[in-house]
């Protein structure tokens, strides 16, 4: 494996000063460095990857056993080996119902039965006088459905959906303010029904509903496997939707965690969403690596993060309804691949997954693109753009949006030379030393890599494809890094310390044994309460 990494580093050193734009001297460059599945088009030609680099990268697939591990995942083997679990979120979108075995048992009858229960429940809510749905969850129980509900707003024909995640009381207070407690459904999304943020918010919502004339027993639902705890909370079993331990939180929007989405867009549109994910599953399993979108997206990511040393990756959807996608992918990628230990217990020998961030275009252009274009750090960018929007009467808006997206990817690659900057300053009337000074501020180094995902329109099927694409990208990158992408031990220590700090913050215990900084901060908080 290391010999491939060494060859990749040597290759990167050879091409680091090469102009990406010069690669387009080959008239076939754009077509050769693009791929497509269905209507989803991936262009990675604006990177400094050439045939030699791509072939070296593909060597990582063989060396890591990616194909075999992909088969293991889809066949229900426990590839989440630190927890001894299968990884089968793909089964949630297996609408054809073909057998998927875990420990010799076909899980699909249970998956399809739960899906049908969801359909009946969701349609019942849609047919009732419920006007608002409040989903209470955090992490994967919030980011996925919140992102998908926003993304598919043109397809909403059900109750309004709201999402509460933060334990900060301001979040639930602001959300519940103005809602009719008698016409609100509250969904509590917590697999264990013990997540402290979620349960704190759930108890507050229950008290609010009771105080304002609602009936929590009839107006609460739970997405959980803890039947005893949901019953103790007062939620009838017919209003509880469980899922198995082989569905990780950040991969769970396809099942019961997606109930709020199903209520918003309806069961038929939700099925289309599932079919989009299933279509990407089939593409990922069947397509040759050179035409395989998840594999190519992963290899480009590895080139930039692990070979070129780029520490972050910007996700830039030129689609306002995908404004929450960067946050969703931040959890999906950073919680999955932000690891420093390989599966066998050895240290990861290359950089792990990058920092993932971003914002919707064109908003980001007026916020952080300055750094992307002229900063000292190279930030690989991933653009997403639809050929058309959902508002035909606003087509001129969408055309301007698309023009901005394509212009940004071109500008990142092309840059602006000092000669061009000087010419502009001459036209502006500058001369002498001031001309030179002003020109330098207008130079763009260029050679900043980007990829673009393009699609006809953001509909449920396409959203399903896009989410599954990124899920499988995470899998491939994790396999190449030799890590388990499906645990998240890094979130545990802070939660444990928060539990021990709670009585100290409450003023019920001394700060003995705490470091000076923590003790000082607790003291400040206690002293400054009203």
Swiss-Prot record:
The pathway it acts in is: Carbohydrate biosynthesis; gluconeogenesis; Carbohydrate degradation; glycolysis; D-glyceraldehyde 3-phosphate and glycerone phosphate from D-glucose: step 2/4
Q: What is its EC number?
A: 5.3.1.9
- This protein's superkingdom? Bacteria
A Pfam family of this chain? PGI
Concerning InterPro entries, the annotation shows:
G6P_Isomerase (IPR001672), G6P_Isomerase_C (IPR023096), Phosphoglucose_isomerase_CS (IPR018189), SIS_dom_sf (IPR046348), SIS_PGI_1 (IPR035476), SIS_PGI_2 (IPR035482)
Quickly give the catalysed reaction: alpha-D-glucose 6-phosphate = beta-D-fructose 6-phosphate
Where does this protein reside within or beyond the cell? Cytoplasm
Quick check: keyword Cytoplasm in the entry? yes
Q: What is its main location?
A: cytoplasm
Q: Which CDD domains match?
A: SIS_PGI_1, SIS_PGI_2
Residues forming the catalytic site: 335 (proton donor), 366, 495
Q: Name one GO biological process term.
A: glycolytic process
Keywords attached to this Swiss-Prot or TrEMBL record, sorted alphabetically, are: Cytoplasm, Gluconeogenesis, Glycolysis, Isomerase
Q: Which family does it belong to?
A: Belongs to the GPI family.
Physiological role = Catalyzes the reversible isomerization of glucose-6-phosphate to fructose-6-phosphate.
Record's protein name: Glucose-6-phosphate isomerase
